[in-house]
């Protein structure tokens, strides 16, 4: 059984994330969506809220599990004996950062490999930050995030 980990803050999960997860789930026997607990920026949603939105959004993909971690990704990978990291690339600008991350992870855990999946063209502009900004001002986020996530965003920003 080949497992892969797709790490991120998922603050919140977007349809772009879900596209990468669905595609990863077609390639690997199991995809573990891993929510970072100790991200450098303060998240809008708590860890429990992010996990809840992921559970709702990914419930129809049978070979996807959701977990969370605090600390180095490679330590988590070693703990569960997984050697594959999935990362999505929206644009060339993502590549430089992701390439550095992949090399660092490889240095810390030589057995691990990072697999890059290029975003679907319709999601290349999409980011969690952009979605939060639109929702904050009451803009339409239909098609950018699952409906459940949109509800949670509007609730958080008290938008009717």
UniProtKB/Swiss-Prot annotation:
E.C. code: 2.7.7.3
Keywords: ATP-binding, Coenzyme A biosynthesis, Cytoplasm, Magnesium, Nucleotide-binding, Nucleotidyltransferase, Transferase
Chain sites annotated for binding ATP: 9-10, 17, 88-90, 98, 123-129
Binding site for substrate: 9, 41, 73, 87
GO cellular component entries: cytoplasm
Membership in a protein family: Belongs to the bacterial CoaD family.
Subunit relationships: Homohexamer.
Designated name of the protein: Phosphopantetheine adenylyltransferase
Organism the protein comes from: Dictyoglomus turgidum (strain DSM 6724 / Z-1310)
Gene transcribed to yield this protein: coaD
């Amino acid at each position: 059984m080949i497992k892969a980990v797709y790490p991120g803050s998922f603050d919140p999960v977007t349809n772009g994330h879900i596209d990468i997860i669905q595609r990863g789930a077609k390639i690997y026997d199991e995809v573990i969506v891993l929510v970072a607990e100790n991200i450098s920026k303060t998240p809008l949603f708590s860890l429990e809220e992010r996990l809840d939105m992921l559970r709702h959004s990914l419930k129809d993909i049978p070979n996807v599990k959701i977990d969370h971690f605090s600390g180095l990704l490679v330590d988590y990978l070693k703990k569960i004996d997984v050697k594959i990291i999935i990362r999505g690339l929206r644009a060339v600008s993502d590549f430089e950062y992701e390439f550095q991350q992949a090399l660092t992870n490889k240095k810390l855990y030589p057995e691990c490999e990072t697999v890059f999946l290029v975003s679907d063209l319709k999601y290349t502009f999409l980011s969690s930050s952009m979605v939060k900004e639109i929702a904050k001002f009451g803009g339409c986020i239909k098609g950018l995030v699952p409906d459940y996530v949109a509800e949670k965003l509007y609730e958080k920003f008290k938008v009717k």
